[in-house]
Regions:
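Membrane-interfacial loop-to-transmembrane alpha-helix junctions, especially the N-terminal start
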Residues: 12, 128-138, 189, 228-235, ...
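Short, Lys/Arg-rich, polar N-terminal cytosolic tail immediately upstream
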Residues: 1-6
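Transmembrane catalytic cores of multi-pass membrane glycosyltransferases
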Residues: 27-103, 157, 198-336, 344-353
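Signature aromatic-anchored transmembrane alpha helix within multi-pass, membrane-resident enzymes
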Residues: 190-193, 240, 329, 372-399
Length: 533
């Protein structure tokens, strides 16, 4: 008994160490990601009568400074933009403070909570003590590698509130249904189930739909097995009510009109279209479905492919008849696949919208792993050991490269902000554009800030809503971004390429010191690091 207890204690310590290490790295990464894009417009009270804060036409800006401002802003937002009242309220709540550190701390905690909820969904057991070290590695590594559009869904303040934080509400609502399937609970408070259903349904469109699908599947199974309890129906009713509040918001129609008439979000031609967006004339044409399949569906499926390995091994090792676990894994797989599939019929397909897919696929992968009898590392063949070491090495390089890219871009954006503050009395302010270090960006892929999300403080159009909001945020004149800057990162000679390798490492070292010990004399350090540019 003592030996068994010691073994369990050792596993618990190892799992806790994995989660804490992952949390520390993710907190560091959170600190590196600056405010950008929608973070500036959402810092102000939403004024729907002037086309809102994200479209051309707004000229007056008043910061959200208290809960009264927030309530006024969200009422206007709900009537004139979209129905994501819970997510956008959280966005504006954390933007009341200028310092992003409060969000960074909370966001890291929410990310770890999301992994714990995924574990409970997959195994039907709550708590760290029920997670083995191998499962902890799958949860942390699998989430980092497979979460779609990681920066936009889990680190960008506005995006994280809409996807990571709303994923908490969705998976928390589904959890009692999962526990019921595993026979862990029978009774559950109806009022709590109804409330969690409303919160889940009123979150985001794809996530709410996925939660409704999974909870509905378990409710139907319970009815067929004569295991139904009234709280399950109350939860579904709450989910449906929440989705109605989300989808029938008066602002949804207004937003579509504004984006078509007064904004540059929707492109005018296919050549101008950004990933996930298409001109109105091409909606529901062959070109739209081809674009969505290539840029959205397949990217999500391929990104999540590593999580299918435990599932494939699970079914390959099976020799007996179909079990309850088989059905549960297939149900999670179906919900995961439904998310990118449904998005094929959406008028917009930003990859971040498929975030809920990774929640349920990771739960399925964890459930499969918990039933596998895998050999220890010492029992593996030399070829398998090499494969494991190679996979770990690639993962470490990917994580480190993403931190280096984010550090370098963070310093570039800090310089933009310092320049704006130092010259805010001028009528026009010109800032250098930001550039991505090519070598580390290649190694990091989309696990770091990349061309799909990077924009610095603003864009190259001084009249763009983002530029106007950033100028109002810092109390400056019009801001222009010099997109024609001949940056050394874009040059092909040997010296420039060497600089593109060494300079980001210096940025990483300085940013690490700044986060750990404080900013210090940042301007002096930045002048030194950029004097060769």
């Amino acid at each position: 008994m003592k030996i068994r207890n010691d073994r369990e204690k050792r596993k618990l310590i190892q799992s806790a160490a994995i989660f804490l290490s992952f949390g520390a790295v993710m907190y560091f990464k959170n600190r590196l990601i600056p405010k950008y894009a929608d973070d500036y417009p959402y810092s102000f009270i939403w004024e729907g009568d002037k086309n809102g804060n994200l479209a051309f036409g707004k000229r007056e800006y008043r910061r959200v400074r208290n809960l009264r401002d927030l309530l006024k802003s969200q009422i206007s937002h709900y009537k004139t933009w979209d129905g994501r009242a819970i997510a956008e309220s959280l966005v504006q709540l954390f933007l009341i403070k200028d310092d992003k550190k409060y969000f960074d701390r909370a966001n890291t905690a929410v990310m770890l909570l999301q992994l714990m909820l995924i574990s409970a969904l997959g195994k039907g057991k709550k708590g760290l003590k029920n997670i083995t070290p191998s499962e902890a590695l799958l949860l942390t590594g699998g989430f980092f590698v497979s979460a779609p559009h990681l920066i936009a869904t889990c680190f960008w303040l506005t995006g994280s509130m809409n996807y990571l934080w709303m994923g908490i509400l969705q998976s928390a609502h589904v959890l009692p249904y999962a526990m019921h399937y595993h026979g862990r609970i029978g009774k559950f408070p109806r009022s709590l189930s109804f409330l969690s259903g409303i919160l889940s349904g009123w979150s985001t469109e794809t996530g709410a739909g996925a939660a409704l699908m999974l909870s509905g599947m378990e409710t139907v199974r319970a009815l067929m097995k004569k295991e139904y309890s009234s709280w399950m129906g109350w939860g579904l009713a709450g989910e449906i009510l929440g989705m109605l509040l989300l989808l029938l918001a008066p602002g949804n129609k207004v937003k579509l009109r504004i984006e078509n008439e007064c904004s540059d979000t929707l492109p005018k031609t296919m050549e101008e279209s950004l990933p996930g967006y298409i001109p109105l004339d091409y909606l529901y044409t062959r070109e739209m479905f081809k674009k969505w399949f290539k840029e959205g569906f397949m990217v999500t499926i391929l990104r999540e492919l590593p999580l299918q390995i435990p599932v494939a091994l699970y079914f390959l090792q099976k020799k007996d008849r179909v079990t309850e676990d088989d059905i549960y894994i297939l149900g999670l797989e179906a919900v995961s696949l439904a998310v990118p599939s449904v998005m094929m019929f959406s008028p917009e397909y930003p990859r971040r919208a498929t975030y809920p897919s990774v929640i349920y696929l990771l739960a399925a992968s964890l459930c499969a792993l918990s039933h596998l009898n895998l050999p220890g590392y010492g029992e593996l063949s030399p070829g398998m050991r090499t494969a494991v070491i190679s996979a770990v090495a690639v993962y470490i390089v990917n994580v480190l490269s993403s931190l280096i890219v984010d550090s370098d871009l963070s310093y570039q954006i800090d310089r933009q902000i310092d320049h704006i503050k130092a010259n805010k009395d001028r009528e026009m302010i010109f800032v250098d554009d930001v550039f991505i270090p090519p070598v580390y960006s290649f190694l990091a892929g989309d696990r770091s800030i990349n061309w799909d999300v990077v924009m610095g403080v603003c864009l190259d159009n001084a009249d763009d809503p983002y530029n106007e909001a950033a100028a109002a945020y810092y109390g400056s004149g019009k801001i222009y971004t010099d997109s024609d800057t001949d940056h050394i990162y874009e040059k092909k000679d040997f010296k420039s390429r060497l600089y593109g390798i060494i300079n980001p490492l210096k940025s990483f070292a300085l940013k690490t010191r700044e986060i750990i010990f404080g900013a210090g004399d940042r301007n002096k350090e930045e002048n030194e690091i950029q004097k060769e540019t």
